[in-house]
């Protein structure tokens, strides 16, 4: 378990975000935490979102749903969402597998639920380069104010964000007072793609209890 420490951050999550003169690469992931109330060691209690800079503002959608459908081999993966939008996760040259649809899902469609942020990606009309721009704070794989010391400024390796258990909220945005947390999950916070770079997809490499490592 990780308990609130009273320090700046309680735990850290490693991504690979970086900033550059053209905007860099930021693929924000929303963090959810759970306390094992029933003590059975399973993530079957209530999940609570950690608030970030986009919580409660115009453009952020709670209770968001997106359904993906199994494609033909080497085909784009189609989706529809709860806002009436549709699109696809496109095959690209960087990933050569036959399917981008998860191998462990036997059904021909599956639905994800969570919170969606407004995308901040854009293409430079002169150079053609795509930029995935950063959010202020509160997200994994993102060069916000909660970015911790370390990380390669060229490719983002070793980049980490710090998080506070005290930022857990109920659905209506009011704070949750958790004694400790036992489970953490990360959901990609944006449904968008940046041209030839492909879809915006949060990368997660490790989780770190800062009360043990003191690596802030």
Which residues are covered by each model-predicted region?
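Low-complexity, serine/threonine/proline-enriched polar segments
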Residues: 53-156
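Short beta-strand-plus-loop segments that form exposed binding edges in beta-rich domains
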Residues: 186-193
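Short N-terminal edge-element motif at the start of the domain
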Residues: 1-36
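Extended, compositionally biased non-globular segments
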Residues: 141-177
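Acidic carboxylate motifs that coordinate Ca2+ or other divalent cations, activating on Asp/Glu
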Residues: 40
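Extracellular structured ligand-interaction cores
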Residues: 8-10, 26-30, 45-47, 178-183, ...
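Polyanion-binding and phosphate-handling cores
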Residues: 25-28, 33, 47, 52-58
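Exposed low-complexity, polar/acidic, P/S/T/G-rich flexible segments that act as propeptides
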Residues: 28-29, 194-216
């Amino acid at each position: 378990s990780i308990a609130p420490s009273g320090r700046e951050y309680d735990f850290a999550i490693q991504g690979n975000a970086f900033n550059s003169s053209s905007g860099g690469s930021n693929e924000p992931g929303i963090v959810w935490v759970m306390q094992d109330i029933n003590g059975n060691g399973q993530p079957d209690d209530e999940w609570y979102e950690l608030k970030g800079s986009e919580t409660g503002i115009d453009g952020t959608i709670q209770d968001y749903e997106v359904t993906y459908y199994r494609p033909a081999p080497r085909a784009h993966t189609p989706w529809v969402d709860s806002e009436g939008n549709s699109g696809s996760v496109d095959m690209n040259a960087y990933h050569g597998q036959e399917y981008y649809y998860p191998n462990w899902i036997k059904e021909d469609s599956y639905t994800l639920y969570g919170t969606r942020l407004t995308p901040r990606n854009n293409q430079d009309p002169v150079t053609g380069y795509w930029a995935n721009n950063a959010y202020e704070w509160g997200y994994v794989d993102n060069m916000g104010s909660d970015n911790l010391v370390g990380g390669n400024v060229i490719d983002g390796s070793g980049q980490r964000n710090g998080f506070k258990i005290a930022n857990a909220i109920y659905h209506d945005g009011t704070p949750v007072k958790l004694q400790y947390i036992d489970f953490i999950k990360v959901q990609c916070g944006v449904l968008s793609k940046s041209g030839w770079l492909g879809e915006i997809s949060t990368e997660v490499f490790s989780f770190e209890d800062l009360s043990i490592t003191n690596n802030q």
